[in-house]
Amino acid sequence: MTVESSTDASSTPPPLTWKTIDWPHVRQEVRRLQMRIAKATQAGHWRKVQALQWVLTHSRSAKLLAVHRVTTNRGAHTPGVDNVRWRTDRQKLQAAFNLKRHGYRPRPLRRVYIPKPNGKLRPLSIPTLHDRAMQALYALALAPIAETLADRNSYGFREGRCCADALEQCFKMLARKTSAPWVLEGDIRACFDEISHEWLLTHVPLDKAMLRAWLQAGYWEKDQLFPTSAGTPQGGLISPLLANLALDGMEQAVKAGTRAGDKVHFVRYADDFVVTGATRELLEQKVKPALTAFLHQRGLELSEQKTVITPIQTGFNFLGHTLRKYGDKLLITPAKSKVQILRDKIRRLIQAALGRTQAALLRQLNPLLRGWANYYRNGAAKATFGKLDYYVWRKLWRWISRRHPKKSSAWLKRKYFSAAGEQGVFSVRYHTQKGQSRVLALYQLASTTIERHLKVRGTANPYDPRYTPYFAQRHCFAWRIRGASRHTPRGAATPP
């Protein structure tokens, strides 16, 4: 072999495997194309948008990222009607190479039902993994357009936005003495199930053949195939994008023809929304008809029973919180129904742990308490946190009393409440696999720092390079907050 041929052979890149994929480079390549799509959308160059979408959906990086998204989300091990799962790295890599538009035909969805908090069942339609990956691939090409065209005060299913942003916007709208005294709580009847296919196919800037195939795939239930003539499946990865595109423009519709003195403001999270107004008559006679007309064009309608107009002094619920004014002071507190749901979960978890170790119980209980506290930490939740801590303490005392019915209270306190070195903290000492001694303590909700959330800018677009430093700064700030929460002395595994 010559030196030249030897050099050529050594420069041949190794075969691609799932573990050797340079994921930062893959994400960078996809984001670069997405930013070009967003720029073309802003300029109204729709032919260029279509061309860039084609490039993105046929790129290897986007296909790899689509499969990565499908195989890392919570439903990765839930199969569709074909009962296929991607367990190995080779299967994942082959799945990415198999994402091709030519000859593609989606399989029907698998219909299952999941319980809702009110006891009813919610239908969930599950695509196959291959169909999920195809949807994830085309969602990468649709997301920059949806983000560019989105309403300023839409916060659900959008990159860089969350429930806390929506609630903070509500606070800004309602906290002042001169803020609107009336609120319309909007509820869309079966939003995901009733969106008009005709409207989506006419207005959504996506490959029409692919979109039509997904919308009309049908679903299997009890060995019977049912057609789908309306709606977008709640189990589909592209469904939240389609729902947002259908509902964007609602903010402009409710504000059309209003004046500053009408105090009409709008906030939406997915299909939940609120509209403020200076008078009940304004919301009833002007805003509500505008909403009805807007939704009718999309095959949707308001739920007359659940769409109500409420004075802010009475309060209303939004995203698991109760927003109510006491005099001139607006408070955002955890909704009573959500507190009760948490109490029920705590009770069932502790009851089911009678035969488990203290450490096993804490490893189940702490993530539940910490997650709930972090969600409600931006409102007036301190009093609720304290009451819940006492509730947990009572349930745990009953749990240990049942385990040791003949032991004294002093003995129980020494065994179960002394390892952390703090009086009254439910804790246990354990050893790691390396033999190191550690203490696992109950997470105290009252130790959670209450702080105002810094709302995202209404015009911020993660696919616009002008906002790249802005979102990077917000990301770093969020990690600092999470880090402080995660390393609180109570509830974490810490050295003794």
Language-model features and meaning:
Residues 50-121:
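Phosphate/adenylate-binding "loop-and-lid" substructures adjacent to NTP/NAD/dNTP-binding pockets
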Residues 123, 227-232, 331, 347-361, ...:
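Short, solvent-exposed helix-loop connector elements
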Residues 105-117, 212-227, 363-366:
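Active-site-adjacent bridging/hinge elements
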Residues 297-372:
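A conserved non-catalytic segment of reverse transcriptases
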Residues 16-75, 140-156:
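Charged boundary/loop elements
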Residues 98, 102, 149-153, 157-161, ...:
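Conserved polymerase palm-domain catalytic core
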Residues 393-395, 400-495:
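Extended C-terminal regions of large enzymes
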